């Protein structure tokens, strides 16, 4: 991983355009090729990014120290004009073991993958643990119309889980082979605040009955 702290301005050119004026920012270049731009006030969410597969070319320009052009397979560009570099270091982190879900969440994922029709009539499973640049999506499915659906599974659904699914959706919807991608937030319990946030973002909520999925007597699934 390469860490660069620099005064820079950023332009995203593609299906959408976005501009970040000059400011001090953290630039992350990961081993998978992804590039992300971070400020000091947004916890974990980058200001902008380019997901792999993408390619970074560093060039020189007259009015700045460097110009980074990051291009993805769709031809979209993330153009980072660097006015001054304050820090530049590279670090080998090795292979990360990844986040280990607790037993119930892992079993819920397995059961829901086996009974994907729980999500709705006509649903089919594309893949469990669909890998993205920011982590694996629990389930990637297709609905009855053939549209992509990302499913995040929790034992207890809270706002953090909705934020996590939101990040996945933002990333997946940049892939022209998958877009448009909708989301389902599935959990045994979903807190009211999480439900409100999910609904506001167009994410469907599904309350899971663990015992019913395991084949024992219980109540029906509730969709809302």
From Swiss-Prot:
The keyword Mitochondrion does not apply. It is an enzyme of class 3 (hydrolase). GO terms for molecular function: DNA binding; single-stranded DNA endodeoxyribonuclease activity. It comes from the Bacteria. Its EC number is 3.1.-.-. One of its GO terms (cellular component) is cytoplasm. It is found in: Cytoplasm. It holds the Pfam family NucS_C. Keywords: Cytoplasm, DNA-binding, Endonuclease, Hydrolase, Nuclease. HAMAP family: NucS (MF_00722). Belongs to the NucS endonuclease family. Cleaves both 3' and 5' ssDNA extremities of branched DNA structures. NCBIfam families: PRK03298.1. This is Endonuclease NucS. It comes from Rhodococcus jostii (strain RHA1).
